[in-house]
Amino acid sequence: MPVAALYDIHGNLPALEAVLEDVARAGADRVVVGGDVVPGPMPCETLVRLLELELPFQFIVGNGELAVLAEMNGRDSGAPARYRDSIRWNAAQLHPSEGELLAAWPTTLHMNMRGIGKVLFCHATPQNPNDVFTRVTPDDRLVSIIGETDADMVVCGHTHMQFNRMIGGLRVVNAGSVGMPFGDPGAYWLLLGPDSSIEQNTTWRWRRREFGRPIIPRLKNSPQITFCILHQRKRC
C-alpha cells in the first residue's frame, strides 16, 4: 500500500497539481497531508482540490493551520510580525465550515507499513508543530523533542527541506515541501512503499516534480505572493 506524504503545500495549487500527477505515476494508493496546507496564495482552491482526491486521504494539522484558526477565532496567531498580514488574509478567505474542518485535523497519525514497520506522521514533532530541527541538530536534542515513541519511522515536515536521520533504531525522514521548498526549485514529496515508476525495489523514496513558468501568473494574481517571498527570504 504505497502512501504519498505531502507536506507544506502552503496554498500553492499549481505545485500541488504537479505533485498529484507524480503521485499517480508512482502508484500511490493513499495520501497523507502533513499540515500547512495554508497559509499561502490560493488557500481555498488548494483545500478544495485535496478534498476532491479520488484516493483515500488523511490530514494532520500544522502550525500554519493553527495560526489561521487562531485568527479566525479572534485570538492572537502568535505568528511573527512579517507573516501576520498573510495569516489575516488567509483567515478572511476561509469559510467558517472550512475552519471547522481544519480544527478537526489531528496532530499525529499512526500507520503500519510492510517493509517499514510502525510509521508516525507529525508536522514537526509529535509534541509541537512549531518545533524546528534539521539534518545537523544534535542527536540528544532530537531525541528530547521527539519524545518516547515505539515507531520505526517518524515522517515530518515544517522546515521545508528533505533529510534522513537515524537515531538509534528510529529513522526520521523529512518529506520536504510541495509548495514552498528551501533549496532547488520544484515540488518535493515522499513516497512510502514501492514506487511503480522505477524497477528498483524501495521501501521509501523522495520525489521531486518540476513545473513550468506558465503557472507563475496564477500565483502572482494573489496578494499573498508576498508571503512566499518573505518565507523564502527567511532562510537567507
Which stretches of residues belong to each language-model region?
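Active-site-proximal segments of metal-dependent phosphoesterases and phosphodiesterases across multiple
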Residues: 77-81, 115-148
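Active-site environment of divalent metal-dependent phosphoester hydrolases
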Residues: 10-15, 39-41, 64-69, 153-166, ...
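Core catalytic region of metal-dependent phosphoesterases/phosphodiesterases
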Residues: 2-99, 103
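Beta-strand-turn-beta hairpins that frame and shape the catalytic cleft
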Residues: 1-3, 111-120, 167-171
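Anionic-ligand binding region
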Residues: 136-173, 178
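Acidic, His/Gly-rich catalytic cores of divalent-metal-dependent hydrolytic chemistry
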Residues: 153, 165-236
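Hydrophobic/aromatic beta-strand patches that form the interior of the parallel beta-sheet core
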Residues: 32, 58-60, 122, 155, ...
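Glycine-rich phosphate-binding loop signature in dinucleotide/nucleotide-binding domains
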Residues: 23-27, 53, 113-115, 147-150, ...
